[in-house]
């Protein structure tokens, strides 16, 4: 990894620290970059106008004993990757040919959105047990790299 990869991953980690997820280990950040310029950022948290999990002082998934990686729709949070893509859509910013830096490997739902957004490269730091997401990235021809310092 080069100095820019390190800088952008540090930025993704900073953005992830803004997460409103009740579970500290689920603070995820994502930034989308093109030509060394940040286009958008995203962190996982409740949609605008919805009470956050931190404010609720609970994780509904933990409360209902939902295993990690299952029933992803049963959560207040919008994923960091989704928020970065949504922000681009709201601002009219094209992500074609851009690189996404993400603190965690995306889930399959985010993988499909990343592919369709036009992002061409993903650099992630921490793994996530979702082999199908990686299979989709491979089939779509998206370059995926695990960040190593």
Predicted regions: what is each one?
Residues 1-149:
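Zinc-dependent deaminase catalytic domain
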């Amino acid at each position: 990894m080069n100095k820019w990869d390190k800088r952008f991953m540090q930025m993704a980690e900073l953005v992830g620290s803004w997460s409103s997820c009740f579970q500290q280990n689920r603070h995820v950040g994502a930034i989308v970059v093109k030509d060394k310029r940040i286009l958008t950022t995203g962190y996982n948290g409740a949609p605008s106008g919805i009470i956050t999990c931190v404010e609720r002082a609970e994780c509904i998934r933990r409360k209902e004993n939902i295993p990690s990686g299952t029933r992803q729709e049963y959560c207040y949070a919008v994923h960091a990757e989704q928020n970065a893509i949504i922000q681009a859509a709201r601002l009219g910013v094209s992500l074609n040919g851009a690189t996404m830096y993400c603190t965690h490997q995306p889930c399959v739902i985010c993988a499909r959105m990343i592919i369709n957004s036009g992002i061409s490269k993903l650099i992630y730091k921490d793994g996530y047990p979702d082999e199908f997401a990686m299979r989709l990235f491979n089939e779509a021809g998206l370059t995926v790299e695990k960040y190593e310092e």
